[in-house]
């Protein structure tokens, strides 16, 4: 087995990048397309809206509870094995989704899809780190960030297009050929990594699943206005499981919950920046369709087209940021990017009464460009701050931070709309501005002496490892 010490050589690197991108496109987009199809699926399968929401919730819950355990498993058995297993499960589950003729069967298939998606998401950044030479890591993460952002933003539009020409099973059928192609490429081209010398911690995996599963369920319950006793019980259970998890993990050398990485100042600050920014992003993503429809009367098709400049701007900004981070501090780039993001969101919240096409599109593009400028340097910092052998823990924590921020953002939109009716969408945009500014402030803290020391410590350790010291 040939282990890469500083990335893969071409053409293997190119094929590995394509494999990682296909898996990410499928897993991220499937989280977005189901929302659009929910009314159609519920009507076709004769299900109530309350029950049909589990098509979305089951997928998200499976990812939430398994991201960190699968990232830890990737360190133990090898990242490519976890990634390929995730691809295989995701593809098979997609076939089950196509064949499902009841809501119960479809929900079970979606939960299986979620576990497969977690296998893909949990180790994808670790694979990127082992695919690219260290000097090109920022560019690799830029491409990765572009794929994630564009897939998430374009998912609803693509779903609407598919539903316009075919039934809802087509949404899941498209994953089958893509998954098979990715499996063939992955087996041949993904990098091998050296397994860690410790066993999988089943007890911590269960506690982690309870902590994040119950925690995000509590946030969702609050957002949807469910009984306060239920939300309080879920939150209390999450706190108890979390305390037990930390006690179990705090003395471990390679903990499933990466406490060792969170002790590195620049890593912890990057995680906090990520949570705040993705909260702002999801506040905007969920609120914008309501805002544009209720306030300005745009149709669903028009809204999809008006939002398109956002992912296009991300597609340009994220790879550019990947090159800039090789020359400028991530804290500075992230701070500037999130301030631009905040300006774009604020400008959208203050659109004129009768906006022109240009009025909307330049604001969308500014928000997308700002987010793209932030995301790549932030992700690179999180991955590079971890010792190479802890890439899995960093990758899993990156995905968990993103999911946590998005869940909080979506719950807040529900809360604002329930409390303030149609004005809630505009209030949500102003809240998104606040989270973006908070993220910018935290990002610039990485320029402090403590943050610099954390980054320098990791660079020294990495240089020593590369030189065999």
Regions found by a protein language model. Give the residues of each.
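Transmembrane helix-loop junctions and nearby membrane-interface residues
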Residues: 98-105, 187-190, 219-225, 246-250, ...
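Intrinsic disorder in cytosolic terminal tails and internal cytosolic loops
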Residues: 1-12, 446-469
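Residue-level signal for the membrane-embedded core of alpha-helical transmembrane segments
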Residues: 65, 119, 210-213, 283, ...
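Transmembrane-helix bundle of Major Facilitator Superfamily
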Residues: 2-188, 317-321, 325-328, 332-342, ...
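Catalytic tyrosine of NAD(P)H-dependent dehydrogenase/reductases that use a Tyr as the general acid/base
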Residues: 59, 106, 197, 310, ...
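Hydrophobic faces of alpha-helical transmembrane segments in multi-pass integral membrane proteins
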Residues: 22, 150, 154, 158, ...
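12-transmembrane solute porter fold
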Residues: 13-29, 34-38, 45, 49, ...
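Hydrophobic transmembrane-helix bundles of small-molecule transporters
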Residues: 164-273, 306, 432-433, 466
């Amino acid at each position: 087995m040939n282990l890469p010490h500083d990335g893969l050589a071409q053409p293997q690197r190119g094929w590995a990048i394509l494999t990682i991108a296909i898996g990410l496109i499928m897993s991220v987009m499937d989280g977005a397309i189901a929302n659009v199809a929910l009314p159609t699926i519920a009507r076709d399968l004769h299900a109530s809206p309350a029950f049909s929401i589990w098509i979305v919730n089951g997928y998200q819950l499976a990812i939430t509870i398994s991201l960190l355990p699968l990232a830890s498993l990737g360190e133990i058995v090898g990242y490519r094995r976890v990634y390929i297993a995730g691809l295989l499960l995701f593809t098979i589950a997609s076939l089950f989704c196509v064949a499902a003729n009841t809501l119960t069967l479809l929900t079970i298939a979606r939960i299986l899809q979620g576990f497969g998606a977690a296998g893909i998401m949990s180790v994808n950044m670790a694979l990127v780190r082992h695919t690219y030479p260290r000097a090109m890591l920022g560019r690799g993460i830029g491409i990765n960030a572009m794929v994630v952002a564009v897939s998430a933003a374009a998912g609803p539009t693509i779903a609407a297009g598919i539903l316009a020409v075919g039934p809802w099973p087509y949404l899941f059928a498209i994953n089958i050929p893509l998954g098979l192609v990715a499996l063939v490429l992955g087996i041949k081209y993904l990098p091998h990594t050296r397994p860690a010398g410790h066993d999988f911690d089943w007890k911590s995996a269960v506690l982690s699943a309870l902590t994040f599963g119950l925690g995000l369920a509590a946030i969702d319950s609050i957002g949807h206005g469910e009984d306060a006793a239920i939300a309080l019980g879920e939150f209390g259970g999450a706190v108890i499981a979390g305390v037990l998890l930390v006690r179990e993990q705090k003395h471990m050398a390679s903990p499933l919950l990466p406490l060792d990485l969170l002790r590195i100042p620049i890593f912890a600050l990057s995680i906090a920046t990520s949570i705040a920014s993705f909260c702002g992003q999801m506040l905007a993503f969920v609120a914008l369709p309501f805002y544009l429809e209720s306030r300005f009367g745009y149709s669903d098709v028009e809204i999809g087209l008006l939002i398109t400049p956002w992912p296009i701007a991300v597609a340009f900004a994220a790879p550019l940021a990947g090159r800039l981070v090789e020359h400028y501090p991530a804290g500075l780039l992230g701070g500037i990017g999130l301030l631009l993001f905040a300006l774009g969101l604020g400008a959208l919240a203050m659109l004129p009464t009768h906006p022109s096409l240009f009025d909307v599109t330049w604001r969308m593009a500014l928000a997308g460009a700002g987010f793209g400028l932030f995301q790549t340097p932030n992700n690179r910092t999180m991955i590079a701050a971890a010792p190479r052998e802890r890439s899995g823990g960093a990758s899993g924590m990156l995905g968990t931070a993103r999911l946590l921020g998005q869940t909080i953002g979506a719950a807040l939109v529900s809360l604002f709309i329930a409390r303030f009716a149609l004005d809630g969408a505009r209030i949500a945009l102003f809240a998104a501005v606040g989270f973006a500014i908070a993220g910018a402030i935290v990002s610039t803290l990485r320029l402090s002496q403590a943050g610099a020391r954390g980054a320098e410590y990791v660079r020294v350790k990495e240089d020593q490892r590369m030189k065999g010291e």
